[in-house]
Amino acid sequence: MFEIKNLSIQIHNQYFIRNLSLTLNAGDKLAIIGEEGNGKSTLLKVILGICPYAEVEGTIFSKNHSIGYLPQMLESNDLQKTGYEYLFKSLEDYYNQVNFLYQNLERLHIDDSLLERTLSCMSGGEKVKLSILKLLLEKPDILFLDEPTNDLDIETLEWLEHFIVETKCPVVYVSHDETLLSHTANCILHLERIYRKTECKHTFYRTTYDDYVRMRRESLAKETMIAKQEQRDYQKREEKLRQVMQKVEYQQNTISRSNPHGGRLLKKKMHSLKSQERKLHDTNLAKVPDVEEGISFRFENVTIPRFKKILTIDIPTFQVDTRVLATNLHLEVMGNEKVCIIGSNGIGKSTFLKTIYETLRNRSDIRVGYMPQNYEDAWDENQSVLEFLSSIGNKEEMQKAMTYLGNMKFTVEEMNGSIRNLSGGSKAKLLLTRFVLEKVDVLLLDEPTRNVSPLSNPVIRDVLRKFQGTIISVSHDRKYISEVATRVYRFTKNGLVLER
């Protein structure tokens, strides 16, 4: 149904994919995984023929099947359209699909009043829902989804999982949501950049995500064990040969000139030993596998008293302009608590978190780190990565910053490059790096795991779970909520409802 043969993708003389071949059939659900900047979105764009900046070799066959594409970001001209204008080219299109439209509005938990608003006024999750709805109306033969779970509320995430599993057409998707990957994928394409990001590598398996992670872990452990054993055996043989050669060399130096026959035998033996040495040095030893692993970081010396009152907020009427988002909002947070706020898309969670930030930012007794939903609100996009961190301290601190950035898998080029060029996941990791360097003790995080790879997300969850300060976050990541949050509130129009 869909086939790729010997596909290679190169950008600025750097390969992101080399000689990729795979075939997809009806019912295949291919998840593309990997660290940020490894070419996952680029691969989708190349397949769709919308990546003019890439040099491409190889062939792509889709046998005239219609293709549906959910991009990571909407086109700027689409943002000025109303929901109706975005979904339908004409009034006739609307009337032809009105029944199908309202069936799916209900399935996606979309209020039809949303269609009257312009996309620029919608939340991130509302835009994603509308984009998915547009795909459903188009009824394509093959679906390509780039980060479909970004900003979606939990109810819609569960619907999306069910849809991916049940649909008969092939679905190719990029995702960092481990729960969705575990529940939906039956094929895995893992894109990596190894040897300090100088070489690309891909791995394709027809298996589930959980089985792939397990097999990869076991395979790497076995390959590493074999390589280390071969290295030990090699060193033993090399040492034994060296000792024999030293002995023969000593005998050559001390043999009597009156024994030419013995000298010839020793010379012949040394010649044989050197031949053995050359063969030994030519041995192809198994190498310890070079793989792209997740990030590494931790908060050092950050503590906050358990009974310290961090936040008390009471808002009788919570509104933006004339739009009332909620009433009777009340929240108290103490030190060491990890509070997570969940709720439907567009209901006001991110706005509430920003309000909390404005309440806490000027407190002198705490150090607040804020990760907004739109990373651009945290910096000047034209700054370099190191310029963004330069206000932290002296040369020693900057060296420390570079070390932390290295642990976050930033290359030297990325450290010196513009923030604008970073992927969403790299921007999230940059903010986390700043929080570590500033030793913040109160974290306000809006979807902290949203753009980070499934290899790095477990690290982030573990670090935040062990964090000795306070966390107030908004998240739809089910693993994050389960593993990190100590209290979970649902944001409703009537206030915060304690769920756990």
Residue ranges and their predicted role:
Residues 1-222, 303-500:
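ABC ATP-binding cassette signature C-motif
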Residues 220-324:
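Flexible nucleotide-interacting loop at or near the entrance of a catalytic core
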